[in-house]
UniProtKB/Swiss-Prot annotation:
Function: Then it catalyzes the NAD-dependent ring dehydrogenation of precorrin-2 to yield sirohydrochlorin. Finally, it catalyzes the ferrochelation of sirohydrochlorin to yield siroheme.
Pfam families in the record: CysG_dimeriser, NAD_binding_7, Sirohm_synth_M, TP_methylase
Record-listed E.C. numbers: 2.1.1.107, 1.3.1.76, 4.99.1.4
Residues holding NAD(+): E22, I23, C43, E44
Catalytic center residues: D248 (proton acceptor), K270 (proton donor)
Reactions listed under catalytic activity: uroporphyrinogen III + 2 S-adenosyl-L-methionine = precorrin-2 + 2 S-adenosyl-L-homocysteine + H(+); precorrin-2 + NAD(+) = sirohydrochlorin + NADH + 2 H(+); siroheme + 2 H(+) = sirohydrochlorin + Fe(2+)
Family: In the N-terminal section; belongs to the precorrin-2 dehydrogenase / sirohydrochlorin ferrochelatase family. In the C-terminal section; belongs to the precorrin methyltransferase family.
Molecular function (Gene Ontology), one example: uroporphyrin-III C-methyltransferase activity
Pathway: Cofactor biosynthesis; adenosylcobalamin biosynthesis; precorrin-2 from uroporphyrinogen III: step 1/1; Cofactor biosynthesis; adenosylcobalamin biosynthesis; sirohydrochlorin from precorrin-2: step 1/1; Porphyrin-containing compound metabolism; siroheme biosynthesis; precorrin-2 from uroporphyrinogen III: step 1/1; Porphyrin-containing compound metabolism; siroheme biosynthesis; siroheme from sirohydrochlorin: step 1/1
GO biological process, one term: cobalamin biosynthetic process
The protein's name: Siroheme synthase 2
Organism per entry: Yersinia pseudotuberculosis serotype O:1b (strain IP 31758)
């Protein structure tokens, strides 16, 4: 972060603008809009400056800049076309510890003025830190088109209601739900857009009189395989509205960083072979949180209905009449294979794909003869500890020992590792990776040499992506 983003309260504060041309005019408008007491210093001024001065909106000081003009000033802007003058303004301001902006000169600037989207009291600032001002302008234009003009009226209404809401609703959860209803109320927004404040007030009163349900709910959300960019839009909306987020080990830190900041977070991580929190206890946590009236998100890696025990958790909630819904996620098989350049199906290689759990606790549960059939791709979840058994059973039931395999560790993340080889090497390969890892078996693995797009990109933000290939000696 090259610049610390901050909004300054400049009402009735003395500011100095050095320069009297058209560029200085634009800066003066911003300072006047902010309520600053503006003094402008220049040898010549545009007619607009004289008009402002005649109206008593600012003061003009004609002549060369001298450091004494900085006395009692909160900040200064240099907007002349003379480099020596701008440099003197900056040096003088810096010596007196006054923030100074020199237009189009990042090296002589202690604060920058971003592109602004003004929906007062909502203010949005966009800055590239002086690196790409045109890009900042384009972003501002996109945001201008997205944000309705009545947004400021809605914010002003919310500000006027804050004390009343605080008195009306004792619990913080109730207040937040009221605000969410008010700020997403379509008819209220339309009334404000039409400047129909009578109708808007009626909608507000209806919201105050309507009972806020204290019945909680649970939303089962798939977080995807790791890359936060693979989280669905609906999943993002849910984690940003949650009162409580119950999450496990497979949810990446990048996804957790998107959770609403004041939401309670409950970690129930579990690993193959042992559970940090027993499944029965997880069920009880979800039940108790929902029964207390909270909006609960059960956040699971990948897709919650594919080896995620999501169905078991919802069965428990259904038995108690707790409302629930499901937001599917990109499952690990899809994400890891795509980021490894391995298509799960291909006309020349596989006409079907099977998703298989690799840590079934009872022998004989898997139909190894069918799994060893040709023209299909196998994806084993949680299979590292059983890699030797998988290798032995597939070869024993007729799958060629030379069948291609790949193990994907931390798939789709910047720490992704892919180890590949032949089925006869699977047990050995499994010792080179750690959990979470996915095992892909099938001739489609051979395509990764052509389609391996992710690790072949040498981005600075992906330094950990590595590839390993084992060869039969």
């Amino acid at each position: 972060m090259d610049y610390f983003p901050i909004f300054c309260q400049l009402q009735h504060k003395a500011c100095l603008l050095v320069g009297g041309g058209e560029i200085a005019e634009r800066k003066a408008r911003l300072l006047l809009d902010a309520g600053a007491l503006v003094t402008v210093n220049a040898c010549e001024f545009t007619p607009q400056f004289h008009h402002w001065a005649d109206q008593g909106q600012l003061s003009l000081i004609s002549g060369e800049f001298v450091p004494e003009l900085l006395a009692d000033k909160w900040l200064v802007i240099a907007a002349t076309d003379q480099l020596s003058v701008n440099a003197l303004v900056y040096q003088s301001a810096n010596q007196q510890r006054i923030f100074c902006n020199v237009v189009d000169d990042p090296k002589r600037t202690s604060f920058i003025m971003p592109s602004i989207i003004d929906r007062s009291p909502i203010m949005i600032a966009v800055s590239s830190g002086g690196k790409a001002p045109v890009l900042a302008r384009l972003l501002r234009e996109k945001l201008e088109a997205l944000l309705p003009q009545h947004l400021g009226q809605l914010a002003q209404l919310a500000g006027n209601l804050r004390q009343r809401v605080k008195q009306h609703f004792a619990a913080m959860t109730e207040r937040r739900r009221f605000w969410e209803k008010l700020l997403t109320h379509d008819r209220l927004a339309q009334s404000l857009a039409n400047n129909d404040h009578v109708q808007a007030d009626q909608h507000v009163e209806q919201l105050f009189s309507a009972p806020l349900t204290d019945r909680g709910e649970v939303v089962l959300v798939g977080a995807g395989p790791g890359d936060a960019g693979l989280l669905t839009l609906k999943g993002l909306q849910q984690i940003q509205q949650a009162d409580v987020v119950v999450y496990d080990r497979l949810v990446s830190d990048e996804v957790m960083n998107l959770v609403r900041r004041d939401a309670e977070r409950i970690f129930v991580g579990k690993q193959s072979g042992h559970h940090c929190v027993p499944q029965e206890q997880i069920n009880q946590i979800l039940l108790q949180q929902a029964q207390s009236g909270k909006r609960v998100v059960r956040l699971k890696g990948g897709d919650p209905f594919i080896f995620g025990r999501g169905g078991e958790e919802l069965e428990e909630l259904a038995g108690y009449g707790i409302p629930f819904s499901v937001v599917p996620g990109i499952t690990a098989a899809s994400g890891c294979s795509a980021y490894s350049g391995i298509p799960l199906t291909h006309r020349d290689h596989a006409q079907s794909v099977r998703l298989v759990t690799g840590h079934a606790k009872k022998e004989g549960q898997l139909d190894w003869a069918n799994l060893a059939a040709e023209k299909q791709t196998l994806v084993f979840y949680m299979g590292l500890s059983q890699a030797g058994e998988i290798q032995q059973q597939l070869i024993q039931h007729g799958m060629p020992a030379t069948t291609q395999v790949a193990l994907v560790e931390n798939g789709t993340s910047r720490h992704q590792r892919v180890v590949s080889g032949e089925l006869s090497q699977l047990a050995l390969l499994s010792q080179q990776v750690s959990s979470p890892s996915l095992i892909i078996v099938g001739s489609v693995v051979s395509l990764r040499e052509k389609l391996n797009w992710f690790s072949s990109r040498h981005h600075d933000d992906q330094p950990k992506v590595t590839e390993c290939v084992a060869h039969v000696g």
